[in-house]
């Protein structure tokens, strides 16, 4: 009996010692879940400033706006460089304080980023086409050639701008300007010529200060202006003298 009890005790002890506890790994630390929208729209840092056009070293040179495009001509205002009309970031900064044109009309020049294709690029000025006009657009280089090729005076520019809203083409506008510059000629009949000839011979073909009253009276009688008589006498002085000398011979 004692032997059997010892065996049972040994068996029980062996079973307890052979039990192996399962090995458990420590639980991993929970990582915060990342929002997929954060990858698509990254948040900019406060001290990170976006690069503007001014930071890139861009300058806007002469104004290339054509003020006579509607009439088929080409007139620029002569503004040589863009000057902002307000502080950076405002709407006034996009308008030139000198010519009041938008910044996009000025030639852009970026230092260190000059495009080699720009030298060969051609710019066609906008033209006004009509059925009666055979005007063809001019081809120009955008590298400061406008100021040399278009030497328009301020008076011509004002005349062209005054006809911008009217339905006239370039040919009609040029005819109008030529008509204004043409001198009006006074028509003189034969009777007036004979009277002027007699009076000029009496004066000796010279207008002297002592004869001013008599000259004014004569001009009122023949219904001609004093300047007309003066010009006629100057133009016919030599011819009349030659005729008189030929007759005497």
From Swiss-Prot:
- Where is the stretch described as Disordered? 11-54, 134-156
The answer to whether UniProt assigns keyword Zinc-finger to this entry is yes
Q: Name one Pfam family in it.
A: ZF-HD_dimer
Q: Where in the cell is it found?
A: Nucleus
What keyword terms does UniProt attach to this protein? Answer: DNA-binding, Homeobox, Metal-binding, Nucleus, Transcription, Transcription regulation, Zinc, Zinc-finger
**Domain comment, in the record's words?**
The homeodomain differs form the typical one by having namely 4 instead of 3 extra amino acids inserted in the loop between helix 1 and helix 2.
Name of the protein: Zinc-finger homeodomain protein 7
Q: State the taxonomy lineage.
A: Eukaryota, Viridiplantae, Streptophyta, Embryophyta, Tracheophyta
